[in-house]
Amino acid sequence: IERADSVTIDAHKQMYVPMGAGLVVFKNPALVASIEHHAEYILRKGSKDLGSHTLEGSRSGMAMLVYSSLHIISRPGYELLINQSIEKAKYFADLIDNDDSFELVTRPELCLLTYRYVPQLTQQALIKALPLSQNTINRLLDELTKFIQKRQRENGQSFVSRTKIEVAKYQGDKVLVFRVVLANPLTTHEILKDILEEQKMIAQESQTILPKLLAL
C-alpha cells in the first residue's frame, strides 16, 4: 500500500456506515488538485472552500457519519469487528472445504469468499473432463447455482448473493458462484452451518438440473 499514490475507501463496507460515504487519501496532499472543480456562482478558483475537492457538488453530510464512527467505534472497535469477520470467513471456507457437496472457488483473503454447490460425482467428472465437457458441466452448474440462490432468497431464512467470475482451473471460464461477505458481527457459526444445509436441501428440489448433472 505504501507504493500507492492514493487510496480510496468505501466506508459503507468495513467501516459500518450507510452507503454513500467514500473517501480518498493522497500520499502527496498537492494531488488533491486533480479532483478540484469550480463554478462561477460558487467554489470560485482560489477560494479556501474544501468543497471544491470532491467529485460531487451538493452533499448530504455523510462525512459526519465517518467522523462519528471513527470516534465511537474507534480503532479497538474496528480491530475487533474486522478480526471477527476474518475469522468467520476462514471458518466458513473450512466448512465448505470439508463438505463434499461444495466447491470453494476463491479462498478469503479478508472476509470475502466465493463457492458453489457441486455434488461429489460432478466434481470427479470435472476433473476428468476435457475443456468442452467442462464447459457443458459448468453451464448446468450455473443453472443450479441460480436456482439455489433464488429459492433460498424466496424462502426468507437466509441469503447469499451470486456473481460470475473467471476460474483459472477451468481455462478462465466464467462460472456463476455464491458470493459471501462476512461483515455482520451477529453472524454465528451455527448460522453459517445452516446456510450450507439449506442450500443442499434446495439443490435436491431441482427436478431437472440436478438429475442432468448426475447423469454426466
Regions flagged by a language model, labelled:
Residues 1-100, 106:
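Active-site C-terminal subdomain of aminotransferase-like
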Residues 13, 72-75, 121, 183-188:
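A generic structural motif
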Residues 18-20, 35-37, 77-79, 124-127, ...:
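Short conserved micro-motifs at the rims of enzyme active sites and ligand-binding pockets
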Residues 51-59, 66-73, 77-84, 93-142, ...:
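Conserved small-domain helix->loop->beta segment predominantly found in fold-type I
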Residues 98, 150-159, 204-210:
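Structural alpha-beta junctions
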Residues 128-135, 139-152, 192-200:
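Short amphipathic alpha-helices in soluble, non-transmembrane regions
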Residues 169-216:
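PLP-dependent enzyme catalytic core of the Aspartate aminotransferase-like
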